[in-house]
């Protein structure tokens, strides 16, 4: 008797779940973000660091760089036709610039990365808010240094492959977080074009490289803001 009641209750639960979340299903899509990056630099010297060393690695102020990318999302959405929650895997390519400046110098650390993360999103009607977190794995770095002396600009550009990154960074793995907002324009029940905006940050870059003496901490980070466009395919909102 108890087993029969349990089976009946389970059947009703399945029916209720299907009816309540009739718009649930798998989703796929891609996203193209384009925006600005504001770099931040922080260094802490050891007590025995000479002044000439401190002057060479002095603190820099924030400057503006350029970010872009192409990411692909896949995951599952649970919804009732009006609101829902989706959990997406977010994988792709990102171009990230950390820009900083001093009195007579500007520096740009430009990374080409593979991006791996997750993107939970909360949907209501045509609107969606997301919070992404993950890592970026660099496969190339271009470091550009612009110096100014007597109103004359000099520029030096150095390219580093993935095997050479440890000469610049103790740990070149980038951690990122990202808040996004987008609006869906539906072309059909299962296809929508997305327009939105984002704000986020990249951090955890230890820029000590091979020169680990005299420096206890030398970190790069950035604040990223921009717009994004994408395409969404699948069932649900």
Per-range role (PLM):
Residues 1-4, 18:
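Positively charged n-region of N-terminal signal peptides that target proteins for export
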Residues 19-83, 224, 230-237:
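Short glycine/proline- and aromatic-enriched beta-strand/turn motifs that initiate or cap beta-hairpins
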Residues 24-28, 62-70, 83-85, 108-116, ...:
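Residues that define the transmembrane beta-barrel architecture of outer-membrane proteins
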Residues 30-38, 66-76, 91-93, 116-124, ...:
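Residues on the lipid-exposed face of transmembrane beta-strands in outer-membrane beta-barrel proteins
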Residues 41-47, 56-58, 167-237:
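Predominantly the C-terminal beta-signal and adjacent terminal strand-loop region
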Residues 78-87, 126-129, 187-193, 235-237:
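Repeated loop/turn-to-beta-strand initiation elements of outer-membrane beta-barrel proteins
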């Amino acid at each position: 008797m108890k087993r029969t009641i349990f089976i009946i209750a389970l059947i009703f639960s399945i029916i209720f779940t299907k009816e309540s979340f009739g718009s649930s299903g798998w989703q796929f899509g891609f996203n193209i973000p384009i925006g600005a990056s504001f770099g931040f630099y922080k260094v802490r010297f050891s007590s025995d660091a000479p002044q000439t060393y401190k002057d060479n690695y002095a603190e820099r102020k924030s400057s503006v760089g350029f970010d872009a990318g192409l990411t692909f999302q896949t995951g599952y959405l649970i919804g009732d036709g009006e609101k829902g929650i989706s959990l997406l895997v977010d994988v792709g390519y990102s171009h990230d610039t950390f820009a900083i400046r001093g009195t007579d110098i500007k520096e740009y650390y430009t990374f080409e990365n593979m991006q791996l993360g997750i993107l939970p999103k909360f949907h209501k009607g045509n609107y969606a808010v997301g919070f992404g977190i993950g890592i970026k794995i660099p496969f190339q770095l271009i470091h550009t240094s612009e110096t100014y002396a007597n109103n004359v600009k000099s520029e030096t550009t150095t390219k580093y492959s993935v095997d050479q990154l440890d000469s610049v960074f103790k740990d070149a793995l980038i951690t990122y977080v990202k808040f996004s907002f987008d609006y869906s324009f539906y072309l059909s029940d299962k296809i929508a074009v997305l327009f939105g905006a984002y704000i986020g940050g990249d951090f955890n870059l230890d820029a000590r490289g091979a020169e680990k003496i005299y420096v206890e901490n030398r970190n790069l980070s950035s604040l990223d803001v921009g717009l994004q466009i994408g395409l969404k395919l699948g069932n649900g909102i």
